[in-house]
Amino acid sequence: MAQDEKTKVKPAVSVRDLTKIFVIGKEKVKALSGVNLDIYENEIVCLLGTSGSGKSTLLNMMAGLEKPAKGSITIFGHRIDKMSERKLVLFRQKYMGFVFQAYNLMPNLNAIENVSMPLAFAGEKRKSREKKAREMLKLCGLGKRMKHKPTQMSGGQQQRVGIARAFVAKPKLVFADEPTGNLDTRTTIEIMEMMVSMARQNHQTLVIVTHDVEIASYADKIYHIIDGTISSVEDNRSKQIAVGSKEAAQIVAAAESV
């Protein structure tokens, strides 16, 4: 989206003067200090920084998982920093999907059951949610792994289940916290191309947290985080990796052959 167009459109996510303080023993540690940012609909954004920079704390606060000491967080016109925990739970169910570094799959559930969980929480009937879960798993290259439990799958396959779960309810906003941190290089590329392709095809906003500049290269915009502040913002559109239908088909085919 061009800069002049953005001035006419309200951001999907707007953060203003965000500050977060943790108390460790008798010491107060400022994890975030006066952070401001705007993320627009359909953008793929990366929060890039080293361990302890504050990037995951910023993501957690935008997801409503932590409360700020100061500042505001507005998502799709709603001030989530003012919401009660109950309202936040309902808001996340309606608008957000999550991809975790550690996958966070239920070990006693198979792939279909894990993927259909967000739909179950939303009250969707079993037949409908399992149909959607199957379709999403096929899209993620797991057509042959639908009945497998997490212990029966590789790390890459588990993360594909995690991605399917994050996208199955078609949330407007997806957060991915170090989504490839436990994966090898080849699987990392496959996972990133799949996740970015799905977000673009479904016109979703994707926010990725990473310490890896290669992962950041998939984003439209990169926020460099240092010591709890945004040190710089990089427009990456001219350099980003584009994923075409041919490449996406190859990724799925490779996954199916495993």
How should each PLM-predicted stretch be described?
Residues 11-225:
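ABC family nucleotide-binding domain
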Residues 6, 32, 52-55, 230-231, ...:
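Intrinsically disordered, low-complexity segments enriched in Ser/Pro/Gly/Ala and basic residues
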Residues 222-235:
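H-loop (His-switch) and adjacent beta-strand-loop-beta switch element
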Residues 1-21, 232-258:
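ABC-family P-loop ATPase nucleotide-binding domain
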